[in-house]
Amino acid sequence: MALTRLLIKDFRNIESADLALAAGFNFLVGPNGSGKTSVLEAVYTLGHGRAFRSLQAGRVIRHECAEFVLHGRVDANEREASVGLSKSRQGDTKVRIDGTDGHKVAELAQMLPMQLITPEGFTLLNGGPKFRRAFLDWGCFHNEPGFFTAWSNLKRLLKQRNAALRQVSRYTQIRAWDQEIIPLAERISEWRAAYSDAIAADISATCALFLPEFALSFSFQRGWDKESDYGELLARQFERDRALTYTAVGPHKADFRIRADGTPVEDLLSRGQLKLLMCALRLAQGEFLTRQSGRRCLYLLDDFASELDTGRRRLLAERLKATQAQVFVSAVSAEQVADMVGEKGKMFRVEHGKIEVQPQD
């Protein structure tokens, strides 16, 4: 799975770019503010329908332009596909696949599985549970065909239930929602639990390589007491939910807890160690997908050198090379990515939103 070509129009500070990409490493080098991260964000947006630095379309559309347009050629298991995405300032989104309109963003996400590693990505480890739920849900989305529909339906039903809690006085008035919510909640929790169990060995092996000085443990918390029946719990907690005006327990409260030597990792590890752990989790997840389905992720690394010394950068470079996946890496200087440069790599110089191929010695 790789992007062979990327066209960018009116995205962030990039007016226009047409990039022929390497199947291996693609390095984006240039000073801060030059547009390196914008290229990474364009790749990410093509696969997700939204940018990773802003959820508002207007903020990523170039100044005084009506929309951004992204287009890519995808080499997927010896089959080439064409994908496109445009978004207007009003939020209108158009997805095109192989020349036809009317497709969903979820189809792009399925075609272009990506792992994003950014300085803001520490939230996976020291942010709230929603970031770790997203980690599990990425895996479930790519491994369970019914997950996306089930999770979308559950979110819709929970939103309706929460709205109803503001208006009802008896549990019987919201029982109809619970009858739909309960089977979805149980199925989603089963998928998440199965995925966390299945990927545990990959995570442990990768973490042992990156952080051998710590004994790391991982546990999935489904969002309600494991000894309780979810339906009975919803009925029992109705008055509390009504007072709160939201549903306090369920898969929307799940977590994937990570400890080092029995202590929450955010309380023990340095920033450099947290970045290594974040990279280990992303790599393990990508490698698990490859083993399960034969598909390879695209890895996007922004500000590669931050928080990592030379030895750790070299270790990460070796692991990324071993995946044989397509990798996009931004750095301030070519020296920072010297350990990654190889015959399958391509170097791009980015300045003021202009992108040029830079010859490698």
From Swiss-Prot:
Pfam families registered for this protein in UniProt: SMC_N
GO cellular component terms given for this protein: cytoplasm
Keyword 4Fe-4S: no
Binding site for ATP: G30, P31, N32, G33, S34, G35, K36, T37
TM region positions: none
Domain of life the protein comes from: Bacteria
Intracellular or extracellular location(s): Cytoplasm
Gene Ontology molecular function terms on file: ATP binding; single-stranded DNA binding
Keywords: ATP-binding, Cytoplasm, DNA damage, DNA repair, DNA replication, DNA-binding, Nucleotide-binding, SOS response
PANTHER family: DNA REPLICATION AND REPAIR PROTEIN RECF (PTHR32182:SF0)
Protein name: DNA replication and repair protein RecF
Protein's organism: Yersinia pestis
Lineage: Bacteria, Pseudomonadati, Pseudomonadota, Gammaproteobacteria, Enterobacterales
